[in-house]
Amino acid sequence: MPKLIVLYPPPADVTTFERRYHSEHAPMVVQKIPGLKKFRAAQVLGTPAGAAPYQRVAELYFDSIESLQTAIASAGGQATVAHAMEISTGGPPVVLIAEDDKPV
């Protein structure tokens, strides 16, 4: 199942970022992105060596690469991307497209 992975850098103000992420952005992802099958998000706590280069990671799952591309190109997808850029005050988020390996 293809997924979009979004990595948010540490923001200028962690409290404001986390509040806006939970109260505005996460609901927007679920409500406005068509074809979304599953949404997972996590706060990054650090690395074994200390501080992490990211504050938060999100995974958005779709049935196919085509449905992922259609979702991001949609009006709801574009609004959600714009909002992600707005709240990511530590720099633009890193966006990756991936697919989970099949279990061995």
Language-model regions, residue ranges each:
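Macromolecular interaction modules
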Residues: 1-104
